[in-house]
């Protein structure tokens, strides 16, 4: 090796050592954690299997509250339902800020209900919750919308005549159509090419965010953003979806009837008109598009992915599917469509759906938060704007609440008498002020779609149950189930 190269390496090593020695600890009162290197943070201590595995390993050493440096920035990690509840419920206001997901932040930039903060978030959340409730309780309730969509699904599955299929885009279609009926005022045919294109962009984006590159980008986005990578594809995908939404908004402008708004976009446009003289109004074009995109994305990917996990688990554990079917026969019968009030009489089915959500662990690290003020927490001081990760997976896999946390077992949610048993550690929708605003719709979709399919079809796989692999294909921000083939066989 040339002398000049050796001298350069020696100089670089010396500089790094000097930085480590002189690196001022500006976060002396943050929770403890592995010692970071300048710029690199805790990169060298990370588990190559991903961020979640790294955080779980750090928890073993530092407990339920600790600090990890993702690149140069400190992030406080909260594990276990007690710490998560203490933050999100007992100190709800302080922990109500929204952090950033590096792969999508350049696109959203704090707009839309999911990534907004401060007054903008309060205005958009209040509007979204109220409008979704109003359109879900009018002439056609959310339950009726889901029941109608479920019947469309049954017709589509019958057309398959028991052929092998990948259910990904069909499950996306049914969940997307529910949110589309509320936001856009219409549903789409399952073969609509523009609709399928949007769903493919959502699927690809969620997968890329959850990929190994997505996790690496979370650490070093300030550097990696200047180079080619999956982040650019994510930005392009979101631009394309946003363009479609913008086109839909213009169509709504042309047909808007102020006396009879037909969906969420119409209602938003009326708010814009009402507040057009207010220079500080949050009812802007940008918030309209990105709020719509946020609801469209969240209302599609999360529930459809849970359904995909659910039917993969039914293939893996056919005795569970058979027991659910027996309960459907007993309570509903073979002909009447399932209704939400049936849930109270179907504890086993409800337990299975809860266990699917718990086991699939769809957002294992939650969605990042920030503290809105200097906050005292368990003897530590968390400075304002510090990021906080709520590791929901540690609640959903807590052995104190779930006897066999790594196994799929509906008995986790049943008491000794077979009645439904709820537990405070079951928090797939998170907690507090940022709890998923679509929780009610998602729970209704899961029950009605799941039971309607099992009422009408049995399932078969080309793979023996014992050979079905449940290992996720990606596990980052989201947990993506493996692709699989399934037959839906009419009963």
Curated annotation (Swiss-Prot):
Source taxonomy: Eukaryota, Metazoa, Chordata, Craniata, Vertebrata
Protein name from the UniProt record: Cytochrome P450 2B6
Result of changing residue 487 to C: In allele CYP2B6*5 and allele CYP2B6*7
Family label: Belongs to the cytochrome P450 family.
PROSITE patterns the record matches: CYTOCHROME_P450
Cellular localisation: Endoplasmic reticulum membrane; Microsome membrane
Outcome when changing residue 22 to C: In allele CYP2B6*2 and allele CYP2B6*10
InterPro entries (UniProt xref): Cyt_P450, Cyt_P450_CS, Cyt_P450_E_grp-I, Cyt_P450_E_grp-I_CYP2B-like, Cyt_P450_sf, Cytochrome_P450_fam2
Cited PANTHER family: CYTOCHROME P450 2B6, CYTOCHROME P450 508A4-RELATED
Biological process according to GO: epoxygenase P450 pathway; ketone metabolic process; steroid metabolic process; xenobiotic catabolic process; xenobiotic metabolic process
Induction of expression: By phenobarbital.
Protein's organism: Homo sapiens
């Amino acid at each position: 090796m040339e002398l000049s190269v050796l001298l350069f390496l020696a100089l670089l090593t010396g500089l790094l050592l000097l930085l480590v020695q002189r690196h001022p600890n500006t976060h002396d009162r943050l929770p403890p954690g592995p010692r970071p290197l300048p710029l690199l943070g805790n990169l060298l201590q990370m588990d190559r299997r991903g961020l979640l595995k790294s955080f779980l390993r750090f928890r073993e050493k530092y407990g339920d509250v600790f600090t990890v440096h993702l690149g140069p920035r400190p992030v406080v990690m909260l594990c276990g339902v007690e710490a998560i509840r203490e933050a999100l419920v007992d100190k709800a206001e302080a922990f109500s800020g929204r952090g950033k997901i590096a792969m999508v932040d350049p696109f959203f930039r704090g707009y839309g209900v999911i990534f907004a903060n401060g007054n903008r978030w309060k205005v958009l959340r209040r509007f979204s919750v109220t409008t979704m409730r109003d359109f879900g309780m009018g002439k056609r309730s959310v339950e009726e919308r889901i029941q109608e969509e479920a019947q469309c699904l049954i017709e589509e599955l019958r057309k398959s005549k028991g052929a092998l299929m990948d259910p990904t885009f069909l499950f996306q279609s049914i969940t997307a159509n529910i949110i589309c009926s509320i936001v856009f005022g219409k549903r789409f045919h399952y073969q609509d090419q523009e609709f399928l294109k949007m769903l493919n962009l959502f699927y690809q984006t969620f997968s890329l965010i959850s990929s190994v590159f997505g996790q690496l980008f979370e650490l070093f986005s300030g550097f990696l953003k200047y180079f080619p990578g999956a982040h650019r594809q994510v930005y392009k995908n979101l631009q394309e979806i946003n363009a479609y939404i913008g086109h839909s908004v213009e169509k709504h402008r042309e047909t808007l009837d102020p006396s009879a708004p037909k969906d969420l976009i119409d209602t938003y446009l009326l708010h814009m008109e009402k507040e057009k003289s207010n220079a500080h109004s949050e009812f802007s074009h940008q918030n309209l598009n990105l709020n719509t995109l946020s609801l469209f994305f969240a209302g599609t990917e999360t529930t459809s992915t849970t359904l995909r996990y659910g039917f993969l688990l039914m293939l893996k554990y056919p005795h569970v599917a058979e027991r659910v079917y027996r309960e459907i026969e007993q309570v509903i019968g073979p002909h009447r469509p399932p209704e939400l009030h049936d849930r109270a009489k179907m504890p086993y089915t409800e337990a299975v759906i809860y266990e699917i959500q718990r086991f699939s662990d769809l957002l294992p690290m939650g969605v990042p938060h920030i503290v809105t003020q200097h906050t005292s927490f368990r003897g530590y001081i968390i400075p304002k704007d510090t990021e906080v990760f709520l590791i929901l997976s540690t609640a959903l896999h807590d052995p104190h609440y779930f006897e066999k946390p790594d196994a799929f077992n509906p008995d986790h949610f049943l008491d000794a008498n077979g009645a439904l048993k709820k537990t405070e550690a079951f928090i797939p929708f998170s907690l507090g002020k940022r709890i998923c605003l679509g929780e009610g719709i998602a729970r209704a979709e899961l029950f009605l779609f799941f039971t309607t399919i099992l009422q009408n079809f049995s399932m078969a796989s080309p793979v023996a149950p014992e050979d079905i692999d449940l290992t996720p294909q990606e596990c980052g921000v989201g947990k993506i189930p493996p692709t699989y083939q399934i037959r839906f066989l009419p009963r």
